[in-house]
C-alpha cells in the first residue's frame, strides 16, 4: 500500500498550499483507516467496504485480515469538521444510560467526573 504512492504528489501539494481554504482532504479507500497531514492539511483515508489489510508498518509486507468493512462519516459545521470512522458490524449493545445520567448530573452541577 505504501509502495504504491501518489503520482504527482508535488502537484497536489502545490494546489493545497496555494488554496488555504482546503482544511481536509478525504480519500478512499486503502483497505485501512489512515489519518495523516499533507501540505499542512489533514488527510483522512476511508477503510474498505470489503476486506481490510493487516496493519503492518513494513510497506513490503501486506496481507488481508478478517476485520469488518468500514466507513467514514464527515461532519462539517462552519469552519470545523469531525470525522467518525466506523465498522459494519452488529455488536452487542451496552446500556450506558446510568453512566450518561451520572455524567450529565455532574456537568449540570459543574463538578468533575471521577475516573476510577
Tell where the protein language model's regions lie, with residue ranges:
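Active-site-proximal segments of metal-dependent phosphoesterases and phosphodiesterases across multiple
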Residues: 1-23, 54
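A broad, low-specificity signal for short, low-complexity segments enriched in glycine/proline
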Residues: 2-7, 33-37, 43-46
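Broad hydrophobic/π-residue packing in well-ordered secondary structure
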Residues: 12, 26-27, 71
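Binuclear metal-dependent phosphoesterase catalytic core
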Residues: 15, 37-116
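Active-site environment of divalent metal-dependent phosphoester hydrolases
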Residues: 22-37
Amino acid at each position: 500500500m505504501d509502495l504504491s504512492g501518489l503520482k504527482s504528489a508535488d502537484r497536489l501539494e502545490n494546489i493545497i498550499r496555494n488554496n488555504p481554504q482546503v482544511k481536509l482532504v478525504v480519500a478512499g479507500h486503502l483497505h485501512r483507516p489512515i489519518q495523516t497531514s499533507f501540505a499542512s492539511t489533514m488527510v483522512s483515508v476511508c477503510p474498505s467496504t470489503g476486506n481490510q489489510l493487516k496493519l503492518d508498518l513494513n510497506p513490503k509486507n501486506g496481507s488481508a485480515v478478517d476485520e469488518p468493512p468500514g466507513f467514514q462519516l464527515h461532519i462539517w459545521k462552519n469552519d470545523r469538521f469531525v470525522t467518525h470512522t466506523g465498522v459494519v458490524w452488529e455488536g452487542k449493545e451496552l446500556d450506558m444510560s446510568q453512566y450518561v445520567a451520572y455524567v450529565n448530573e455532574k456537568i449540570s452541577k459543574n463538578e468533575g467526573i471521577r475516573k476510577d
